[in-house]
Each structure stands twice: as structure tokens, then as C-alpha cells.
């Protein structure tokens, strides 16, 4: 059994998780990363995706995040999400609204850089939609 460490998942609305866990898989901007106890210190941005938490009791919890930052130190990990919700509580209409807004942002972009950023975000959202919502 892996050693436990402190993990917190915080959104502007509330503290979703604050407990001892064995591991956390984070959708980092540069790719998924697994955090375990005594991880090297790092701060990274997170992209829209699913955070998978393996609890110290052996259970698994999944949360959808819509961007933010992860602060990882040897003693723990704090994920500050722009928005977060348990996968089981995902609102299909809210996700559809976010996708529509991203499409509009891409269409209304003033330059190539803004368009590219909006299209990347749209791609992340549609990938997320396919990963968590049944057809």
C-alpha cells in the first residue's frame, strides 16, 4: 500500500476534497501526471479534464475540473480549480453551454493566437465531454 499524503481540491465555490490520499492523477497542461507522497515540488497549470483520486481507504473518486493550478510539494498537493464538480454530478447542459461559448470565442477571435487558444480549449472540452458523458 502506498504512503498517504494530504490532497485538497478547491474551487471558488467550495472545498471539494481535503483528505489523506494515496495518489492523484491531474490533467496537467503538458499531459497527465500522477502525484504520490514525497513528489518533487512543482507548480503546474491544469487543463479541463478529470482528476482521479485514490483515497487512503482504497476507494476512487473522480472530479471534473475546468482549468486551474496544482501546487505539489513533498507533503501534499493542492489543486486550485477554476471550476470543479464530482463526475457523478456533472451537468450535461452546463458542459454544452461551455462548449458553445468556446465555439463562439473561436469564431470571434481577433487574431490567430487568440483563435488557436480558443480552439485548443474547445478541443479539450469536447474530449472531456466524450470521456465523462455516455452517448
From Swiss-Prot:
Main location: membrane
Source organism per UniProt: Mesorhizobium japonicum (strain LMG 29417 / CECT 9101 / MAFF 303099)
Any Pfam family the entry gives: ATP-synt_DE_N
One annotated Gene Ontology cellular component of this protein: proton-transporting ATP synthase complex
Protein name (record): ATP synthase epsilon chain
UniProt GO molecular function: ATP binding; proton-transporting ATP synthase activity, rotational mechanism
Subcellular location: Cell inner membrane
Family: Belongs to the ATPase epsilon chain family.
Description of how the protein assembles with itself and partners: F-type ATPases have 2 components, CF(1) - the catalytic core - and CF(0) - the membrane proton channel. CF(1) has five subunits: alpha(3), beta(3), gamma(1), delta(1), epsilon(1). CF(0) has three main subunits: a, b and c.
Described function: Produces ATP from ADP in the presence of a proton gradient across the membrane.
Membrane topology: Peripheral membrane protein
InterPro entries assigned: ATP_synth_F1_dsu/esu, ATP_synth_F1_dsu/esu_N, ATPsynth_dsu/esu_N
Keyword Cell inner membrane among record annotations: yes
Superkingdom of the organism of origin: Bacteria
Keywords carried by this UniProt record: ATP synthesis, Cell inner membrane, Cell membrane, CF(1), Hydrogen ion transport, Ion transport, Membrane, Transport
Gene3D superfamilies reported in the protein's UniProt record: F0F1 ATP synthase delta/epsilon subunit, N-terminal
Amino acid at each position: 500500500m502506498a504512503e498517504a499524503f494530504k490532497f485538497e481540491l478547491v474551487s471558488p465555490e467550495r472545498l471539494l476534497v481535503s483528505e489523506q490520499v494515496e495518489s492523484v492523477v491531474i490533467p496537467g497542461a503538458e499531459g497527465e501526471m500522477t502525484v504520490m507522497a514525497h513528489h518533487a515540488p512543482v507548480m503546474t497549470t491544469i487543463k479541463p479534464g478529470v482528476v482521479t483520486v485514490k483515497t487512503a481507504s482504497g476507494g476512487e473518486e473522480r472530479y471534473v475540473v475546468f482549468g486551474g493550478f496544482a501546487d505539489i510539494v513533498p507533503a501534499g498537493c493542492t489543486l486550485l480549480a477554476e471550476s470543479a464538480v464530482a463526475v457523478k454530478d456533472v451537468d450535461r447542459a452546463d458542459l454544452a453551454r461551455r462548449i458553445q461559448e468556446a465555439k463562439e470565442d473561436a469564431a470571434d477571435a481577433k487574431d490567430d493566437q487568440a483563435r488557436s487558444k480558443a480552439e485548443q480549449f474547445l478541443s479539450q472540452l469536447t474530449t472531456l465531454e466524450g470521456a465523462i458523458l455516455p452517448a
